[in-house]
Amino acid sequence: MLIDFQNLKIVCISLKSSTERRNNFEQMANRLNFKNWSFYDGIVLSDHIEGCAMSQINVLKENMDDTPVLVVEDDIQETEFYKNTIDLSDVTNMDALYLGYSNWAAHPIRAQMSLLSGPSTFIKIKEYYKIANVTSAHAIIYISKKYKQACADGALKYLTDPTGNRHCDVVYAKLQNEYNVFATPKHFFYQNCPRNKIWTNTPIE
């Protein structure tokens, strides 16, 4: 499977009020010549964690098929490693591909803080890394319908799980242990914000 980012469907989750972030994303989309992208107006709730999760869930539900879709957050910035196309032919049955990731849970203590079973793992398979317990949801290509459904269902259930922290990216990190989820060796995107840049602007290799 060849992924062509200029023609791939891309959905950017963004609050309507986030004018600066929207402008920055639109400039990047134009710079990278994205032709099939749109904003999804993020759900505004007093509970920001729930609003974030429900926005992610709704985007997945609106794209519930086996067609790849890149779901991104509005604070992303491309890196020097970005390229217009990637070939996924060498990896069969891929459910999702992370184009950006966080090294937050790479340390056992931080993984424990996020209520994960262990630190992040990365296993090289041909050109990509099979990942588990990797947090973040700022740049993911969802490929299979079954994985989209699992993420949507898991995120919704986790909001009321008394043993969890309710963050949808933690659900996704847990699901990586059950599905064929991979990441690019070099990150194509990072979160260009003070809180997350330190964790997301690092490659796997």
Q: How would you name each of these model-derived features?
A:
Residues 1-72, 76-205:
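An acidic/histidine-cluster motif and surrounding catalytic segment
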